[in-house]
Amino acid sequence: MKKTVSLILVLMTALFACLSACVAEEAANTGKVQKYGNIGRLSKLNITEDELNDVLKDIMVDSICDKYVFYDTMNDMLMALNRGDIVVLETDQNTVRYIASRNDNIADRPPYMNPNMLVFCMLLREEDAELRDQISACIAGMNEDGTIELMKQTYIEDVIAGEEPDAIEPVAFPGAETIKVAVTGDRPPMDYVSAGGNPLGFNTALITEVAKRLEMNVEMVNVSCAARGIALATGVCDIVFWMEVGDFENWEGADFEDQPENTVVTDPYMSVPLWWAVLKDSPVVNVYRDN
């Protein structure tokens, strides 16, 4: 009897996976794509939720999701995923891998359609173009000497594997200029805050090393994701960590810039694919498009 029950469970699991995996093929034959729900993502500074959905309305016809829903914090978006308000949490691959490593019920997977590449850089006010150039020069030097690769291992790969790095201690330069950097804590392991309230993550380590090389002081300022634009414009912070879509200029119908007005960005220091976090018991986990 036990063997029979086990066999039935195995067959049911295989059938579920098969049916889910066949959705894309069936859609190709019928010309329609089955919709499962909405995609969540963190709020953007340069475009509203409605504007993004309008730009992507033609693309979303071929998506397994209905529309995008913005969230101000990663915690809010995770709760929405677990409640079923959204079926996909969309962000950069490193953050999705981190989320999946800390949540047994969540899987990481590529998007249904071809993933965009996300480019990591820093956003500054337009009048701080000289500082932008100095930071870009530091990024180039850190790429050349291998510092960025070492930081990726320590602050991304090791953290995803379960290790916690030492606290990041900025070097003090008495009398030197202080640059204030916004930390949201919403994109671990790139940008997060420890249980003790200390800013951690790859981005924090990177800007700390940049400040050291420029012989500047650095101050981390906790800012919510949605308030980054206001914080930058009003001088609460001087730098915001920023992600751009790598092929944004090819987006058909995009009539807005991929960054807020009156800002400049540094040269990129990393690029990773856009990625999905989905519940393991969701049919979406096994739905892939044959690109």
Role assignments for model-derived ranges:
Residues L9-C18:
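Bacterial N-terminal signal peptides
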Residues A28-D92, Q134, L150, F173-W251:
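Extracytoplasmic small-molecule ligand-binding "clamshell" domains
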Residues M1-I8:
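Positively charged n-region of N-terminal signal peptides that target proteins for export
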Residues E144, E163-I168, G175-K180, T184-P188, ...:
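Flexible loop/hinge segments at secondary-structure junctions
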Residues C18-K32:
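Sec-dependent signal peptide cleavage junction
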Residues A107-P111, R228-E244, F248-L274:
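Short beta-strand-centered segments that line the small-molecule binding cleft or hinge
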Residues G37, S43-D50, D54, P115-G162, ...:
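Extended ligand-binding regions for polar small-molecule ligands
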Residues A100-A137, G185, Q259-E261, P268-V278:
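Periplasmic-binding protein-like
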